[in-house]
Amino acid sequence: MEVFMFPTGTTVIISVLSVLLAVIPWYLLNKLWLKPKRFEKLLKAQGFQGEPYNLSVLKDKSKQNYMLKLQQEDKSKSIGLSKEAAPSIFTPVHQTVRKYGNNSFLWEGTTPRVIITDPDQIKDVFNKIDDFPKPKLRSIAKYLSVGILDHEGKKWAKHRKIANPAFHLEKLKVMLPAFSHSCNEMISKWKELLSSDGTCEIDVWPSLQNFTCDVISRTAFGSSYAEGTKLFQLLKKQGFLLMTGRHTNNPLWGLLATTTKTKMKEIDREIHDSLEGIIEKREKALKNGETTNDDLLGILLQSNHAEKQGQGNSKNIGMTTQDVIDECKLFYLAGQETTSSLLVWTMVLLGRYPEWQARAREEVLQVFGNQNPNNEGLSQLKIVTMILYEVLRLFPPLIYFNRALRKDLKLGNLLLPEGTQISLPILLIHQDHDLWGDDAKEFKPERFAEGIAKATKGQVSYFPFGWGPRICLGQNFALLEAKIAVSLLLQNFSFELSPNYVHVPTTVLTLQPKNGASIILHKL
């Protein structure tokens, strides 16, 4: 009689191992060699050029190594203001474009990053938000997840709708006194540093960071201002740890117990608990029928409450507490970083080009005299606006936008395979001679005398705040804050670049002066 024998545990294990030993080599071969080479062949067939793929790119940490090198380099090594900023900021992209031209690509591990510089193709990328989503956050970058910036599809649309009222111009007008108050406090501190002849030399960068932190703390949290300031310091620490973390893009990060990861977890928990406490107090007051504050958080919670009421309080409608926490992070990271970057480069360039500083001051005094700026007058500042636009062209807060393809797609006449990443190098496009003329790298605010559309000839070649449906919600906030700050500074001081100023633009979360910004102030 034949007896059926069930496989023993050992037999099962051997069978599983045999399958794995057969599958894993093929998986690795495809992932590490065959698939990247197919990408390369397809891209080169369409006229793209780049370094040939080889296994050495898996060890290539050029971006991380560059960041570390930049942190350690001698501060006396200066980059002249007349030179483009790109080589010192994002060397891999710049060097790729310089070597292979605009139609080029580079490798990030096994993933090709295609560099797109054609305005029509850029327009398509920005407009077709479902086809060209942002890359998914990996590893510790999740600790700086900033709300609506990271969302896609229906969740993005819902959050955009709820957050939008907080940034309407009518709401922002109410916040203008807070902008002026914070800036006047900074100016008062600077005046205390003046010598008997009414001058002093100061690194304005830390002061401008504190000013924009002060503004966002007041306008985002109102009466919770002190808590807001503490949150800013915590988020600043998170940003520093993220940018200096060696394993940020390592998919195995979650399995690694590292000091940086542990610190980021601790800070994230502290941020979460602080924001949760602020939000719960506000929501309780809202439910009790108390008047909401006219700060960003109050308007956001009111809008969220209205959305839930309109949909029958469904749990799937509106923002959760965690969603609101993420949006509060965005208030800080986007609101503070963007404006401080814009202001410091504005002072640097106006310090270098005194004729434009004089023209801007004349305009400010003509519109406001020695009074605090008001909303009606801000709309009349044509020269100041031209200057700010030109500063954003030469020194945009972000130096590139990335997008990821989750399916094969056509972009103009290009066929891009699933898995490809797209890079829109803002800095290079803003200084492209073909798009902006032979004076593309020069500071010439007059190019914006008739507005952005005229300066760009209707092309998508200028996008410091993004473009299309996902354009930055806070751009009006940032520009109003910058106009008020520039106006108040010009009313109180003339200023020039110090001989001690060393021009080394670098990117942390935004484009910043690595060695600070030494400015000589003269009291007016």
Curated annotation (Swiss-Prot):
Enzyme class, first EC level, given as a word: oxidoreductase
Coiled-coil boundaries: none
Tissue expression notes: Expressed in flowers. Detected in roots upon salt treatment.
Enzyme Commission no: 1.14.14.115
Chain sites annotated for binding heme: C472
Membrane topology of this protein: Single-pass membrane protein
Family matches, as InterPro entries: Cyt_P450, Cyt_P450_CS, Cyt_P450_E_grp-I, Cyt_P450_sf, Cytochrome_P450_Monooxygen
Pfam families on file: p450
Cofactor(s) named in the record: heme
Organism domain of life: Eukaryota
GO biological process, one term: glycyrrhetinate biosynthetic process
Membrane-crossing residue ranges in chain numbering: 9-29
Gene Ontology annotations for the cellular component aspect, listed alphabetically: membrane
Annotated catalysed reactions: 11-oxo-beta-amyrin + 3 reduced [NADPH--hemoprotein reductase] + 3 O2 = glycyrrhetinate + 3 oxidized [NADPH--hemoprotein reductase] + 4 H2O + 4 H(+)
GO terms for MF: 11-oxo-beta-amyrin 30-oxidase activity; heme binding; iron ion binding; oxidoreductase activity, acting on paired donors, with incorporation or reduction of molecular oxygen, NAD(P)H as one donor, and incorporation of one atom of oxygen
Induction section of the entry: Up-regulated in roots by salt treatment.
PANTHER family documented for this protein: 11-OXO-BETA-AMYRIN 30-OXIDASE, CYTOCHROME P450 FAMILY MEMBER
Role noted for this protein: Involved in the biosynthesis of triterpenoid saponins.
UniProt-recorded name of the protein: 11-oxo-beta-amyrin 30-oxidase
Gene expressing this chain: CYP72A63
